[in-house]
């Protein structure tokens, strides 16, 4: 059990113990190696995309690739907030995290995660303008406007993370301190609160639901218009290139949003599949982003070849 501090009112939790993901003991070493390799590949893959964007003047001046570079930066940080603790889950050591560390992790997890939600929406809007309004695209979406929109996404994400962290840790925690999860996240932490959590669960449902649902609906609306525009393209090659560009984004969005909706719109429930679902958008998605966008994007591949060729 973690440390507690006696007060005149009750015992106050000063740290939490992360129980991690359920796994067979005989697979501990293998899982440690797998997640460690995934983490290293995630960092290297996203760093490679960032360096490619910065090294190629043609790419770093275009909104589509500015957004892709920001996504890679977010993926690196989101992965660093969650995966190292998940890796420790497969070691014999006790996975204790200080109370303040738990607060910080929950804040950054939701800050970065919600910022990523907003960024996916901006990426869909950018593709909508590029395909549906090609002649007006340079006016409607330029580097300066893209920078302002990205800054707005960061501010909105920070506000979302602050709201969730404040609401979660304003509650008293005076009893059990074992978090049945691999990170400090809202549903798992709320189960340990020494107070009624109905209001928190409702706010989580509404707040996360509004952010996720509104972003997802805007993305679907953008792609409905995009598909309609693509079907009007007369050349087969033109349709193929447009679908290829948009297909990468749709794959990433699906892998990210479906697990989020599964977990946070059921905040009061306890499902053993929650941990597996969370692995998708905390571990798998940051790894897939550089692979999908690199392998399916001819311009990125060409830029990589130019850089590696010197």
From Swiss-Prot:
Organism superkingdom: Eukaryota
Keywords linked to the UniProt accession: Cell membrane, Disulfide bond, G-protein coupled receptor, Glycoprotein, Membrane, Olfaction, Receptor, Sensory transduction, Transducer, Transmembrane, Transmembrane helix
InterPro entries documented for this protein: GPCR_Rhodpsn, GPCR_Rhodpsn_7TM, Olfact_rcpt
GO BP terms: detection of chemical stimulus involved in sensory perception of smell
Parts of the chain on the Extracellular side: 1-29, 81-104, 166-202, 264-274
Keyword Cell membrane: yes
Cytoplasmic compartment residues: 51-58, 126-144, 223-242, 296-310
Positions of glycan attachment: 6
Pfam families: 7tm_4 (PF13853)
A single GO molecular function term of this UniProt record: G protein-coupled receptor activity
Entry membrane topology: Multi-pass membrane protein
Gene Ontology cellular component list: plasma membrane
TM ranges: 30-50, 59-80, 105-125, 145-165, 203-222, 243-263, 275-295
Localization, UniProt: Cell membrane
Broad class of where this protein is predominantly found: membrane
Disulfide bonds: 102-194
PANTHER family for this protein: OLFACTORY RECEPTOR
Function: Odorant receptor.
Sequence similarity: Belongs to the G-protein coupled receptor 1 family.
Protein name: Olfactory receptor 10G2
Species name: Homo sapiens (Human)
Protein's gene: OR10G2
């Amino acid at each position: 059990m973690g440390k507690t501090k006696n007060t005149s009112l009750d015992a106050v939790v000063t740290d939490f113990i992360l129980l991690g993901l359920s796994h067979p003991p005989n697979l501990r070493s293998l899982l440690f190696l797998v997640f460690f390799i995934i983490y290293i590949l995630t960092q290297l893959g996203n760093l490679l995309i960032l360096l490619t964007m910065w090294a190629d003047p043609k790419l770093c001046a275009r909104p589509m690739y500015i957004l892709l570079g920001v996504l890679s930066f977010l993926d690196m940080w989101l992965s660093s907030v969650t995966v190292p603790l998940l890796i420790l889950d497969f070691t014999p050591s006790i996975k204790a995290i200080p109370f303040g560390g738990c607060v910080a992790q929950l804040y950054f997890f939701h800050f970065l995660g919600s910022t990523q939600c907003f960024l996916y929406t901006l990426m869909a809007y950018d593709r909508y303008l590029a395909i549906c309004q090609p002649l007006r695209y340079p006016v409607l979406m330029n580097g300066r406007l893209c920078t302002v929109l990205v800054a707005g996404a960061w501010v909105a994400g920070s506000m979302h993370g602050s709201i969730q962290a404040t609401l979660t840790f304003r509650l008293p925690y005076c009893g059990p301190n074992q978090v049945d999860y691999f990170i400090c996240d809202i549903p798992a932490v709320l189960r340990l609160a020494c107070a009624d959590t109905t209001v928190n669960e409702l706010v989580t449902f509404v707040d996360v639901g509004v952010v996720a649902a509104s972003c997802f609906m805007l993305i679907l609306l953008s792609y409905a218009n995009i598909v309609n525009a693509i079907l009007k393209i007369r050349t087969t090659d033109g349709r193929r290139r447009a679908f290829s560009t948009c297909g990468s984004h749709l794959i990433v969005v699906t892998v990210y949003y479906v697990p989020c909706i599964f977990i946070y719109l059921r905040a009061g429930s306890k499902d053993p599949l929650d941990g597996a679902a969370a692995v998708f958008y905390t571990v798998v998605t940051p790894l897939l982003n550089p692979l999908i966008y690199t392998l399916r994007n001819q311009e990125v591949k060409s830029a990589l070849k130019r850089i590696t060729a010197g």
